[in-house]
């Protein structure tokens, strides 16, 4: 049984355990509460709170998720009391002397962290806001100051916005949670960058991934288990197409949950995996759900609910529900809801999941044939403004008072200043604007015939709080036109065998006729000629000069062809 207590004004959850004591202090703040221009502030604050503690004999860690941040430890009661007391002290009096060091550690952490198949999904669904921010680097780190962190801590890391959970016999003696007073913060509203669903996008990953948002309920978590069994059977056991087939269910804190399913593949089997994945989804959508799969998933959950450690294991999710204001079920209530789930309930979840689904497909593939609309990669509109041509290509940049647009092959890209989530600014004048809808536009002054004031116009219109100054780039990394004169120089055309003889014949003929014509013209001016003869002689001279030009023309054209 989970007891609800109070420690220094912080709601506290206590459950017995037969193993080592462990505890966590969880706050209702995460990456979804940040802006892209200040992304990384919660993660940095988490690192600063832990930095002075040094090495520990027991497991100690912190974690920053989209809607919560937690500090947890496993060890003796005394060690846990010391750890959590110190964390709270550091949160109220941040060790900002380590600010630059921890920033570098976070940059190193990001650069050394491998990419996962699902990393880009949040930005495709949500854009460059709230739940989509986890897809981006922590670009805000460089500009964050000690005052920024103190203000963030004062707003989010408070007694009312925290929950303590302990798996052990009792609250450790000497534990003090000296946190400032504040208010419980609501979960941010989730934005959407998808004009219609179901939708799909193309990724460089070899995996096929389903992302869906469903109403949080027991039947939805059961559906995730049924889907995983179906994918395993179809793509691994029967087809031998995938090694990894998984499905998961994660509450979001706002009455909804994220459901994700994944199947990997070899390059030569991507087509078959995509087809098998879609077939499995279609099977569940039309209600072809195996009762045996449903029974197996429910039985597995019931086995977990019957273990001695069930209450201790449920503490983190129980704390999450307290923070987000969602209902916590007792073990008996959870067991009763599991038993009540039937095939019709799972079918209802399948329809809901697929109606709002986002499917990630490998590069070179599509999913419109299965009823999924392509997620937008271009903007629906443009802005009016001064036009600047690309030095290479046919693209055109428009810089206006409302935003910037690029018009070129594939359709326009537009970022309006009022909807700009972030602008990265380099000292050499380059700018990258990212819209709330995740549309990104890079402006390289070296690649456009820009007026010197164009960049200043953009800088003056993007709100200062959304601008991040980037370090200077190596000159070799600044793009340059391929040729200083404009288009790339072409190789001369290969000479044909007949060109030289034609040029020689044309030249000799033009020289002979032109010379004779020159002498005749000169004679007309230095000799007496009867008036009756002048008319036809000048006609002969005119025809002669025209013939000379015609004979010389092949030489001129062939020489121009060689340039």
Identify the residue ranges that each predicted region occupies:
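C-terminal regions of mature proteins
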Residues: 162-168, 299-421, 429-434
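Acidic/histidine-enriched segments that form metal/cofactor-coordinating
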Residues: 57-152, 276-279, 291-317, 460-463, ...
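Membrane interfacial helix motifs at helix-loop boundaries and amphipathic/re-entrant anchors
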Residues: 516-543
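Non-catalytic, conformational "gating/processing" segments within enzyme and secreted inhibitor domains
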Residues: 146-178, 355-359
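His/Glu-based metal-binding/catalytic segments typifying zinc-dependent metallopeptidases
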Residues: 10-29, 180-234
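M16/MPP (pitrilysin/insulinase) zinc-metallopeptidase core fold and M16-derived inactive scaffolds
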Residues: 17-83, 226-242
């Amino acid at each position: 049984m989970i007891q609800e207590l109070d420690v220094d004004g912080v709601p506290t959850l206590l459950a017995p355990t037969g193993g080592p004591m462990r505890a966590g202090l969880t706050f209702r703040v995460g990456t979804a509460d940040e802006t892209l221009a200040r992304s990384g502030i919660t993660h940095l604050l988490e690192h600063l709170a832990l930095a002075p503690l040094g090495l520990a004999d027991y497991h100690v860690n912190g974690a920053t998720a989209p809607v919560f941040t937690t500090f947890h430890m496993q060890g003796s009661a005394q060690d846990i009391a010391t750890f959590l007391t110190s964390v709270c002290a550091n949160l109220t009096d941040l060790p900002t002397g380590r600010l630059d060091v921890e920033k570098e550690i976070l940059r190193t952490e990001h650069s050394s962290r491998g990419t996962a198949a699902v990393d880009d999904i949040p930005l495709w669904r949500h854009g460059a806001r709230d739940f989509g921010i986890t897809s981006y680097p922590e670009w805000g780190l460089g500009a964050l100051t000690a005052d920024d962190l103190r203000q963030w801590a004062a707003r989010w890391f408070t007694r009312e916005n925290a929950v303590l959970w302990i798996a052990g016999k009792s609250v450790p003696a000497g534990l003090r949670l000296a946190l400032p007073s504040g208010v419980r913060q609501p979960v941010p509203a989730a934005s959407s960058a998808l004009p219609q669903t179901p939708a799909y996008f193309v990724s460089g990953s070899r995996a096929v991934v389903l992302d869906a948002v469903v109403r949080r309920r027991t039947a939805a978590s059961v559906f995730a288990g049924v889907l995983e069994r179906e994918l395993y059977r179809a793509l691994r056991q029967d087809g031998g197409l995938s090694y990894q087939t998984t499905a998961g269910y994660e509450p979001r804190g706002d009455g909804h949950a994220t459901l994700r399913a994944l199947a990997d593949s070899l390059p030569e089997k991507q087509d078959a995996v995509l087809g098998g994945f879609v077939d499995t989804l279609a099977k569940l959508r039309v209600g072809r759900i195996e009762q045996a799969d449903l029974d197996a998933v429910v039985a597995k959950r019931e086995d977990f609910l019957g273990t001695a450690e069930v209450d201790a294991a449920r503490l983190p999710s129980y704390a999450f529900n307290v923070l987000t204001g969602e209902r916590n079920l007792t073990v008996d209530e959870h067991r009763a809801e599991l038993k009540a789930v039937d095939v019709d309930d799972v079918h209802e979840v399948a329809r809901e999941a697929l109606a709002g689904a986002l499917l990630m497909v490998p590069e070179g593939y599509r999913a419109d044939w299965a009823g999924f609309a392509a997620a937008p990669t271009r903007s629906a509109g443009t802005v009016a403004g001064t036009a600047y041509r690309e030095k290479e290509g046919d693209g055109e940049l428009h810089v206006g008072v409302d935003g910037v647009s690029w018009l070129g092959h594939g359709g326009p890209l537009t970022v309006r200043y009022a909807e700009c989530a972030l602008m990265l600014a380099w000292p050499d004048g380059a700018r990258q604007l990212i819209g709330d809808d995740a549309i990104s536009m890079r402006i390289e002054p070296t690649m456009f015939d820009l007026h010197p004031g164009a960049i200043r116009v953009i800088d003056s219109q993007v709100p200062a709080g959304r601008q991040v100054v980037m370090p200077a780039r190596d000159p070799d990394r600044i793009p340059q036109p391929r040729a200083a004169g404009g288009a790339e120089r072409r190789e001369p055309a290969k000479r044909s065998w007949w060109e030289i003889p034609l040029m020689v014949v044309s030249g000799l003929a033009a020289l002979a006729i032109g010379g004779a014509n020159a002498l005749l013209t000169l004679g007309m001016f230095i000799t007496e000629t009867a008036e009756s003869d002048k008319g036809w002689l000048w006609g002969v001279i005119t025809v002669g000069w025209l013939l000379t030009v015609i004979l010389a023309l092949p030489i001129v054209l062939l020489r121009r062809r060689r340039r």
